[in-house]
């Protein structure tokens, strides 16, 4: 089925508010994508992350009047990194923070509640943060066409004409072409949504021409979505409304209430609403699919990334220091170490500092099973990289033993860590470069290069960078438990949870634990 598109008339342009859903974890792209640093924040294809590219391509949507705000829905732990990647890329962002992942239907419901409270019911262009679009003009044109139908009360999804028999995508059965005033704008009724098919069924869909890939991009008026979700998934609507009403604004962030949101069921836009619209004609809401011919790809797996990247004459994709010998149709990426492949075909090799994936290219959908096993075994590689981004900078876990850990910590100029303490570990800090401002108990002092200090178990402390260049320190932790959840925060400028009262002064206990020569050394260093 080849759609015929006519120019969209100019009067009465819909006003479109872009909504980016950035709550995914990207487990099938492990070990590069991890829970604390998911795929939408990683430079997977180029020197730009998918989230940054998504925000940038929203500038100048054709056939619609773009509002002056971009709405981003993301997880609490990704808020600072996500905000940094959209600032300056598109309109000014307003960021809704989900305390827990609940799939796309609750995320869109929160966005619709937020916009109707602050606006006059705009048309929402809702899209995931992890798609690749090669033809931005065609994408913007499709959004503008879909917005025309949405303005009149439909919920519109963008469908992609399949290029191959893909088993990793959902499909939409395309119904009759829309007629009437907007009949020439490429819209079709939706027959049904189909889950990811097996290979034989995907081949049938490809050759029939009546089944398009489900892009996961939706266009709807905020009020229309709220009407649909209230009728078809009332528990989602009720929980999201309660969570939004009890939420707290903090500069460009809006933090929904965690306790209320905890009661929200997890469901997708497709399952909660789109698949059920035809069974509820009393709602008066039509589901429409508009074609998207813009070089769309959902980069959810390593084979999907291999598919769209430039290849050598043997069909190989290399990123990083890679050597191929008698190897074909493979994807190899190294974050540092040299990787050599000999006599291989259809393999994926991903090297990181603390984990290496080697997989058959046709089995990469099963990478998520590895991540689940790592979580069961409580391995840190399931959720964090060795190098971990924080609002104040980053740290790199250089070495880890049974009762010790060595970290390289970099604090950006003007940034500070939270005022905190640990119940199970002591810390030694050595300044490599820059100047450190240290709070330790009742003391505050500066440390310069080659100077050091000691933080005892249970001692309240803070590290700051008051200078103009990055502060780099080596931290040596020792204790019987070294997990990142052994942090009690008393003050934090990044909105992380804090306790309200400081503990009793630990001076006496510290003196009992600390050798006299270490105390003397600390006085000398200060």
Where are each of the predicted segments found?
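Noncatalytic nucleic-acid binding interfaces
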Residues: 473
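Conserved N-terminal catalytic core of the sugar/cofactor nucleotidyltransferase
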Residues: 2-21, 27-140, 144, 160
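A short acidic, often aromatic-flanked loop/helix-cap motif at beta-alpha or helix-coil junctions
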Residues: 101-106, 164-166, 199-201, 296-297, ...
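Conserved core of the sugar-phosphate nucleotidyltransferase
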Residues: 135-263, 281
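A secondary-structure boundary/capping signal
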Residues: 21, 127-129, 221, 292, ...
